[in-house]
Each structure stands twice: as structure tokens, then as C-alpha cells.
């Protein structure tokens, strides 16, 4: 029986990771010759379940995962330009010359994390029956971590490749067939309980049933369970580095926002419901945050230092903790560069970013008092400072002063969700359904949460986005997209924001207007290549296509490798 290449890698790395994880816990798992022996002797108590949960986080810290998280969300966006160390593979993606043999089309590392999660979800219930000390609350918390991390991995895969195989079982043995389809009609019929057979299914009859919706809907179901099961908080050291209820709610809000956008053209009423679902999840996060001691937005003056240099700040919800694990964050240091680590950047901040801080319709020059305009990147040489930076110039008048990077042994956490993102997700959802002047003003108020805190003075009349000049739904929709870029630049979100906009509109015209500034040459050629929404996704890796006959290539790339 043919075996999928990616899942051969999964099984191998899973066994090795077990050994590494347990060694750290002063235990040792002897590498047995077959999977059944390992399963029989390993899954005996709650501590062993936790060790595999921790392996999920640990593998997400690998460069193969981290660099894709950043590149998939930033490389083609309008907020970066090519740096001196950019690779040929990265340049090909930027220039819309991507082929299916491009290394960044390899999704294996994400399915490795998914496999760890699948093992937890399969085996933890049995361990609960074996170990009397493995209490129900702890068991559910571990399950919530696995559900949420698996959903997070699928969220990146969905937004990068669109149609991806949904693997919900762990690799068990050489005899297990993992040639899973990414157009699994039989699975759709079963999941949605459709009154048709797989053979008679047609997309014309069920326009909201396809692989993308199937994976999105399943992950939303899982995240609802995760919200119910998740720990409200861990101890202080782990409260931001492990999945909590707030983290599950934040990811669920993001999924609702995505589903609302992909449904907007075909099912506007369902789309409206999901925008409201997104807002409800954001409200849940904010309500729980209000009950926590010292959980709040960091001041603008401390934003770079506390949120991105120190990490685990008062506005954090979930971040991968490199600072406590001792593992190197090869994503930010390699791609954004760091002089203290002798790393030249693959990516620089786009020159056009300075214009973001000159768009306050009240007539103020935002760049003169918005901390983000000098702390997130160096406006002199366009080096990205967020994450790898330690100390920016102390005031706006000294922008030619030295930017000090974190030292060679200092590692940046990677932030998936923080309070700023919650306010802006809620703002985006509300902007899509706002029908009254009061609701439109509420969108501006939400954007002002991040805008006002980033300004230097306490004069909120001056340092605010004026609701009087954002009078229409179109105005506030554009405002949200702009404020998300000002606040969340270089956090792996911008490309997905623009793709979400394209899916919402049903075409790429408006989204292309943002990224057109990314190109100096061959603009017409690249625009033509990017004219289809399918071209905004990446092709499935060629090795996967060769080994798994059940995979179908993204339609845009079916003839690209000929």
C-alpha cells in the first residue's frame, strides 16, 4: 500500500519527539520496533498525556513551522519588500512564479503538529480511565489544547492552500492508508448528512459544501468544544504560552470572521450570522479579560519593549514561548534580521508604510506622535524592528539614532493573539454589518482602542480617529484594514487580511490595489497572473501530488508545472 510521504515524516518525527519530550521529564521512552508496543507501554498516566501536549507546542517552534507562519502571512503583502538575504524560493513566490516544487509549498511540518494533536485526542480518553489521578478538569484542558492547536494549524493551511486533506486520526502503523483526499466528497456527504450519495453530489445543488467549508466547519465545531473544555488560566509562567479559554475563543472568532468572508457572496445571511458570532467571541474574550488582574493594553511608550521584547505582556492572549523553552526562534531572526545575531534580513519594511501614519483625516501628522511609526521598523533603513528589536530611539526627534537589537541568546516569543487583535477583529466584523450611524461610530471607537494608546500625548481630542470623518460603512471598512496594518504589521496577518477581503468581494480587484505597490517591474504581467483568487493560494507540493493519488492540485496551478 502506498504511503503518503508527509505522514511517513509525521510518524518518524512523532516517535523521536516522544523520546525528546520524555527525556526532559527525566523519563526515557525506548524506541521500539513497532508502533503497537509504544502505544501499549506509553499511554498510562496523565503526565504522559501532558508530555505529548507539550510536544505539540515544541514542534511548532521549529524553523520549518515558524518561517512558514511568517512567510505565508507576510511575503506577498504590501507591508514588506525584499531584503538582502531573500532566497530564490521566496522571490519566486513574490513574483507569482511559484511552482509546486517550491520549498514553501511543503506543508509536512504542520501535519506533524496535527499528528501530535490527533494522538492526544485519541489516547487521552483511555488514559483518563486508567489513571485515577488524572482528573476530569485536567483531562478536558489537555483536550482543549489539542483541539485548538490542531485548528490553528489547519487555519494556516486553509488560508495558504485552500483545499487541504482533513486528517483526524493519528498515524498508527505502516498499514494505515493516509492517501487522504483534499476533495473528499464522501466525507462531505457524511459530515453534513446530505440526502445524496457521494457519486450523485453536485456543487450546484450544495454551493456551500466543499473541502474548504468542510474543514472550516469541522474546526469551528472542535473549537466550540475547546472553549467549553479549556482551562481559564494556568500558572503565571504558562498563562500566555498555553491554550486557555481566551485563546480558544480568539481563534474561534478568527474562524467565524473567515467563514463570514468566504460566504458573503453566496450566502449573505449566513455571513451576517458569522460576523455576529465573531463579535460574540470577541466580547467573550474581553469580558474574561476584564476579570483578570492587570490584563489590559500596554501603553504606547512600552508597546515594543513589553509586548515584543519581553513577551507575555498584560495584553497577551496566546504566544509561543521561546523565552522560557530556551529554543531559538529562527523565524523572526532569520526573516527579519538581527545584527546581534549576524542575520541579514530576508524581508524589509515597505517604504509605503510611512504613509500609514499620515492618514488621520483630522489633519494631524501621525508619524510625529505614533510610537508604532518608529518602534515597529526603522524608517531610515526600513529594517523590521518588531520582535527582534530591543531598544528603539527614545523620542521621535532622534530617528537617526541607533536601534539596538536583542542579543544572540535572547529569543522573541511569537504572538498569535493579543487584545489589540480582538478589538480589531470585532471592528472588522461590525464594519461589515453596520447599518446605523451609531454602529459606524462604534467601529471607529474600537479602532481608537489601539490608535489612541499608540500616541504620545494625553490629548484624546487631538490623538484620535474622528468619527465625524468616517461616516459610511465603506469608510470604516477601509479604516479597519488600515488600523490592522498599523497595529499588526509583521505579525503574519496582512496577506490573510487582503485575501479575506478578496474572498468577501468575490474578486481580487481591491486587494490588488494594495499589493500593487509591492512591484516595480512587470506590474502588468504580475497583475494578470494574480487576477484569479485561486492564484492567491499556493500550489500543493509536488512530492505530495506524486505520492498521494487522491490529491487534486489547485486549479490555477494544474498546468503551471508543465
List where the protein language model places each region.
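Short coil/turn linking the two alpha-helices of tandem helical-hairpin repeats
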Residues: 158-160, 165, 234, 258-268, ...
Amino acid at each position: 500500500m502506498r504511503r503518503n510521504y508527509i505522514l511517513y515524516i509525521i510518524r518518524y518525527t512523532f516517535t523521536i519527539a516522544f523520546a525528546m519530550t520524555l527525556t526532559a521529564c527525566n523519563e526515557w521512552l525506548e524506541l521500539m520496533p513497532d508502533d503497537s508496543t509504544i502505544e501499549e507501554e506509553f499511554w498510562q498516566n496523565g503526565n504522559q498525556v501532558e508530555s505529548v501536549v507539550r510536544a505539540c507546542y515544541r514542534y511548532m517552534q521549529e524553523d520549518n513551522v515558524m518561517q512558514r507562519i511568517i512567510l505565508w502571512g507576510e511575503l506577498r503583502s504590501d507591508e514588506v519588500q525584499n531584503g538582502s538575504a531573500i532566497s530564490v524560493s521566496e522571490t519566486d513566490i513574490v513574483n507569482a512564479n511559484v511552482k509546486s516544487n517550491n520549498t514553501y509549498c511543503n506543508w509536512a511540518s504542520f501535519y506533524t503538529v496535527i499528528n501530535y494533536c490527533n494522538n492526544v485526542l485519541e489516547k487521552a480518553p483511555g488514559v483518563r480511565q486508567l489513571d485515577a489521578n488524572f482528573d476530569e478538569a485536567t483531562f478536558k484542558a489537555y483536550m482543549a489544547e489539542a483541539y485548538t492547536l490542531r485548528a490553528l494549524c489547519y487555519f494556516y493551511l486553509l488560508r495558504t492552500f485552500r483545499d487541504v486533506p482533513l486528517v483526524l486520526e493519528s498515524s498508527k502503523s505502516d498499514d494505515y492508508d493516509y492517501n487522504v483526499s483534499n476533495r473528499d466528497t464522501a466525507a462531505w456527504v457524511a459530515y453534513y448528512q446530505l440526502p445524496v450519495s457521494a457519486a450523485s453530489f453536485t456543487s450546484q445543488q450544495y454551493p456551500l459544501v466543499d473541502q474548504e467549508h468542510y474543514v472550516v466547519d469541522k474546526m469551528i465545531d472542535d473549537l466550540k468544544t475547546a472553549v467549553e473544555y479549556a482551562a481559564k488560566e494556568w500558572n503565571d509562567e504558562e498563562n500566555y504560552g498555553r491554550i486557555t479559554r481566551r485563546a480558544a475563543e480568539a481563534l474561534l472568532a478568527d474562524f467565524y470572521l473567515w467563514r463570514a468572508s468566504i460566504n458573503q457572496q453566496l450566502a449573505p445571511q449566513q455571513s451576517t450570522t458569522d460576523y455576529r458570532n465573531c463579535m460574540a467571541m470577541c466580547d467573550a474574550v474581553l469580558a474574561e479579560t476584564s476579570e483578570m488582574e492587570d490584563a489590559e493594553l500596554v501603553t504606547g511608550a512600552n508597546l515594543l519593549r513589553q509586548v515584543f521584547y519581553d513577551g507575555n505582556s498584560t495584553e497577551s492572549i496566546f504566544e509561543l514561548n521561546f523565552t522560557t523553552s530556551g529554543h531559538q526562534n529562527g523565524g523572526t531572526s532569520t526573516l527579519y534580521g538581527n545584527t546581534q545575531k549576524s542575520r541579514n534580513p530576508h524581508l524589509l519594511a515597505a517604504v509605503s508604510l510611512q504613509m500609514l501614519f499620515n492618514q488621520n483625516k483630522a489633519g494631524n501628522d501621525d508619524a510625529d506622535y505614533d510610537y508604532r511609526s518608529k518602534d515597529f521598523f526603522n524608517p531610515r533603513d526600513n529594517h523590521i524592528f518588531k520582535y527582534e528589536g530591543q531598544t528603539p530611539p527614545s523620542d521621535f526627534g532622534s530617528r537617526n539614532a541607533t536601534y539596538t537589537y536583542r542579543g544572540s541568546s535572547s529569543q522573541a516569543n511569537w504572538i498569535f493573539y493579543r487584545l489589540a487583535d480582538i478589538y480589531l477583529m470585532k471592528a472588522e466584523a461590525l464594519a461589515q454589518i453596520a447599518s446605523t450611524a451609531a454602529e459606524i461610530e462604534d467601529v471607529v471607537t474600537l479602532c481608537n482602542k489601539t490608535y489612541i494608546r499608540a500616541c504620545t500625548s494625553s490629548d484624546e481630542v487631538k490623538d484620535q480617529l474622528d468619527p465625524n470623518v468616517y461616516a459610511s460603512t465603506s469608510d470604516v471598512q477601509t479604516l479597519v484594514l488600515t488600523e490592522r496594518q498599523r497595529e499588526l504589521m509583521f505579525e503574519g496577518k496582512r496577506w490573510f487580511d487582503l485575501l479575506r477581503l478578496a474572498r468577501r468581494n468575490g474578486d481580487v480587484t481591491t486587494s490588488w490595489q494594495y499589493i500593487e505597490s509591492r512591484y516595480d517591474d512587470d506590474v502588468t504581467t504580475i497583475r494578470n497572473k494574480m487576477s484569479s483568487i485561486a492564484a492567491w493560494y499556493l500550489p500543493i507540493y509536488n512530492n505530495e501530488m506524486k505520492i498521494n493519488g487522491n490529491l487534486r492540485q489547485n486549479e490555477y496551478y494544474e498546468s503551471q508545472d508543465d
